[in-house]
Amino acid sequence: MRRILFKSKIHRATVTQADLDYEGSVTIDRDLLRAADIVENEKVAVWNITQGTRLETYALEGEAGSGVICINGAAAHLNKPGDLVILATFAEVEEAEVANWKPTVVFVDKDNRVVPGQTKEIPGPQRRSA
């Protein structure tokens, strides 16, 4: 049996652009794609923290070091510049690999730059009590 598991995410990125007239997709800074192990054309979930919307699209590579997170096409109606989003991917994993599976989590600052050394999520209740 194969299971679909969380593969990687870019956590709390800031939308820098929303281009309604583009065909679709989300353009992501190449440095962030590499850090999160996301490849161009890979299916990406976009969870908008600010608006509460969710959608699926695919990744396009943006200029390295630019910090770009550009929501393209019709999805631009649901995501505006300044919104905080989570960009997530999933992978099919063989049952034998599930116990040792480790997703990649990338935290970014307000300029969509990778925050070095911060790689582990803290569950909500633990975070609030700390």
From Swiss-Prot:
<keyword id="KW-0670">Pyruvate</keyword>
<keyword id="KW-0704">Schiff base</keyword>
<dbReference type="InterPro" id="IPR009010">
    <property type="entry name" value="Asp_de-COase-like_dom_sf"/>
</dbReference>
<keyword id="KW-0963">Cytoplasm</keyword>
<keyword id="KW-0865">Zymogen</keyword>
<comment type="function">
    <text>Catalyzes the pyruvoyl-dependent decarboxylation of aspartate to produce beta-alanine.</text>
</comment>
<protein>
    <recommendedName>
        <fullName>Aspartate 1-decarboxylase</fullName>
        <ecNumber>4.1.1.11</ecNumber>
    </recommendedName>
</protein>
<dbReference type="GO" id="GO:0004068">
    <property type="term" value="F:aspartate 1-decarboxylase activity"/>
</dbReference>
<keyword id="KW-0456">Lyase</keyword>
<keyword id="KW-0566">Pantothenate biosynthesis</keyword>
<dbReference type="GO" id="GO:0005829">
    <property type="term" value="C:cytosol"/>
</dbReference>
<feature type="modified residue" description="Pyruvic acid (Ser)">
    <location>
        <position position="25"/>
    </location>
</feature>
<comment type="subunit">
    <text>Heterooctamer of four alpha and four beta subunits.</text>
</comment>
<keyword id="KW-0210">Decarboxylase</keyword>
<dbReference type="Pfam" id="PF02261">
    <property type="entry name" value="Asp_decarbox"/>
</dbReference>
<dbReference type="GO" id="GO:0006523">
    <property type="term" value="P:alanine biosynthetic process"/>
</dbReference>
<feature type="active site" description="Schiff-base intermediate with substrate; via pyruvic acid">
    <location>
        <position position="25"/>
    </location>
</feature>
<comment type="similarity">
    <text>Belongs to the PanD family.</text>
</comment>
<comment type="pathway">
    <text>Cofactor biosynthesis; (R)-pantothenate biosynthesis; beta-alanine from L-aspartate: step 1/1.</text>
</comment>
<dbReference type="GO" id="GO:0015940">
    <property type="term" value="P:pantothenate biosynthetic process"/>
</dbReference>
<feature type="binding site">
    <location>
        <begin position="73"/>
        <end position="75"/>
    </location>
    <ligand>
        <name>substrate</name>
    </ligand>
</feature>
<feature type="active site" description="Proton donor">
    <location>
        <position position="58"/>
    </location>
</feature>
<dbReference type="InterPro" id="IPR003190">
    <property type="entry name" value="Asp_decarbox"/>
</dbReference>
<feature type="binding site">
    <location>
        <position position="57"/>
    </location>
    <ligand>
        <name>substrate</name>
    </ligand>
</feature>
<keyword id="KW-0068">Autocatalytic cleavage</keyword>
